[in-house]
Amino acid sequence: NIGPRTYAKICELLLRLKANHLAPAMHPVSTAFYKIPENKLVADTFAIVMGSSHCEPLLLNTASEWNSKTMGPWDYGKNKDKINEVLGNRVKENCAYENVYTLALRGLHDAAMGGGDVPMKEKVKMLESALKDQRNLIAEHIDRPVETIPQAFTPYKEVLEIYSNGLELPDDVTIIWPDDNFGYMKRLSGLHEQKRSGRAGVYYHVSYLGVPHSYLWYSTTPPALMYEELRKAYDTTADRIWLANCGDLKGAEMQVSLFLDMAYDIDSFNANNVVTYPARWLAKMFGEQYYSVFEDITSSHINLAFSRKPEYMGWGYWNNYWGGGEKRTDTEFSFANYNEAENRLNEYSRIGKKAENLLASLDKDSQPAFYQLLYYPVKGAELMNHMTIKGQYYRQYVRQQRAAANLIKEKVKNYHDSLQIITEGYNSLLNGKWKYMMSLKQNYEGSSSYFMLPLMEESYTPVGAPKLALQAESEILDKGGISYHSLPVYNTFSRKSHWVDVYNQGSGDLSWTAKSSNDWIIVSQKAGKTPTEDRIRVSVDWEKVPVGESIKGSVEFSSNDQKECVLVSVFNPASPVRDEMQGVYMEENGYVSIPAAGVHRKFESNDIKMNILPGVGVEGHALQLGNPISPLQMYRAGDVPRVEYDFYTFNAGIYDVYTYVLPTFPLHAERDYKLPEHTNSDTKYSVRIDDGSISTPSTSAIEYSQVWYDSVLKNCRVNKSTLYVKKPGKHTLQIRCGDPGVVIQKIVIDMGGLKRSYLGPESTKCN
């Protein structure tokens, strides 16, 4: 359990990290801090200022220390005197030590205070009364003016609604603004709150237990996101207390170091250098000669986890509240479209191999620390993604009756077993120094199942003679057997290649040949022999292909008496000329895809500057529409600050424009925040094509809604605007500033050809 020896190590670590404040473990599985008298002596020896979480008033761990059988209900309306007696004793016992006293009235176990359907006015009145009582207890036991004693109030979850409905809070109390548990600050100090003598602080999560899904295995919170959110907090007077929820700490060491370094000197950071923090942090420990490889591995690892954390790969929800456990399902990464799943797995394999090679090259004394800090997180994420996505591959292979199905099944089992092995390796380092510290299961029994072997109940054993079957890129088939297939249209402005899977549905070796109908069709392999499958790349020789908007050809695949044909269509118009379209985002297969950082023109003002943010967003870079604390903009005004992108379409019509945005909340200082915590006001920006109508989507969503669930799990809200394009040709897409600080990740325009995927297609820029 956690006692003085553990807290001595924690307090020493805090001093080494330039920290001086600790809110100890609060869940019943850990012995409450003040149940062991030596704990506070340890903290005092290290000059650590003790505090407590948002639901623990006056240092009392209500989840563990309140005994309803002997003390009565934890209900301020029914048991006020006993509650105040216990709280007063806690202050009396600890008044000789340095503390920050939390003023709070929440229920047990991080829940809302009970009492039924109480009108909001009564909730406000009750909380004000409780806070007044707690202030009186502090004044009674500490011989100093109460205004000089550090006190904190955290408007977390339902308490924010009460605060927003007129709660009167003493001016000297520090308001600790919380994030939404997923790294997005829900609210910051407005102009009137910035004048408070108590100023403000932050309560920020780099680890979390709760809905829609916990992330407790190890932290992958992006440094760029942390800086973007915490900088705007600091700039609005949240500079008094910074508190990070770091779970069991070991899995969040880099994020905790960054959090405290920013708390100590945030002005030494900016949007560019914070991205390299993980590499610099590692290089300081293992040698500057490894900096470039550290930067490559960490930037890719964080970017991959940005769109889906390893803990979320089961694609279900943390389900402890409703019973029955997490319901796992297929991921939304596409196997058929935009090479999405394949690219993700290939990138994980690349950085996993780099981390493996680096581990082997280090001296033995450095290997244990490197194993924990980089190798295990990267290799673990690689194996988790391969296990989950390949498990989904297996289920598809069975439906297609591919002979390779059982090979995939064995690989999935190996990924699962390897996860157990590297976790056991972590816990056996240095003769078991960190034994039990790392576990794949970081949750209540049954509430999450992301770490378990994927469902593979079906099986397929190929029988009979070898049998030819095909799947072409962007083709979704449950079974092979059709004799006609088509690839995505080849476009002279992108000049991509596409793939065809040649696979065997029988046993034995499948011998096959491929024959192109025209000399401008290039096949990567013209013949083969495989017991399972071959992937063939089909490309176009653009020096030989005729000019035209609908050039047709084909590739015929044969095996014995079987023949299957793949249609090859080429779009190679005489006009516009490819060289004249350099840098323009071109329509391709019925869509246009634009990375938000790939701006053609910026229109800025004294207040609003457009900034490229590296290290954040599904494309690795994103665009921020001004500083978050800048004045609100009139997004319909003609001269509003905006960015523009040039795109070209070959058809007119009504099209859907999808904007991928960071799911931030409205934080502008002049906003009216009198709203419940689960009905936050919208954070607006606007979208326009040419001089057409203006659409005004939002980045925020009602908390605990399905939109919010999806947005925080993806670190992205996808908004649809339906706009009109009058005629074919070159057009301008505008993204216009409304609430400053909105972060745009990418834009996709669907002309009718957009396929299903998780992150959308890659850029269609003509280069």
PLM regions and their residue ranges:
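Aromatic- and acidic-residue-enriched carbohydrate-binding clefts of CAZyme catalytic domains
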Residues: N1, L13, D44-V49, S53-K121, ...
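Feature activates predominantly on carbohydrate-active enzymes
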Residues: N1-G77, C95, A152-P155, G166-Y184, ...
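Gly/Pro-rich turn-and-neighbor structural signature
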Residues: Y34, V42-D44, G72-S197, N343-A369, ...
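Extracytoplasmic
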Residues: H485-S486, F493-N767
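Beta-sheet entry/capping signal
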Residues: N20-L22, K40-V42, A47-H54, E98-T102, ...
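Structured mid-domain segments that build the active-site/substrate or prosthetic-cofactor binding neighborhood
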Residues: L15, N20-A23, S30, W177-G183, ...
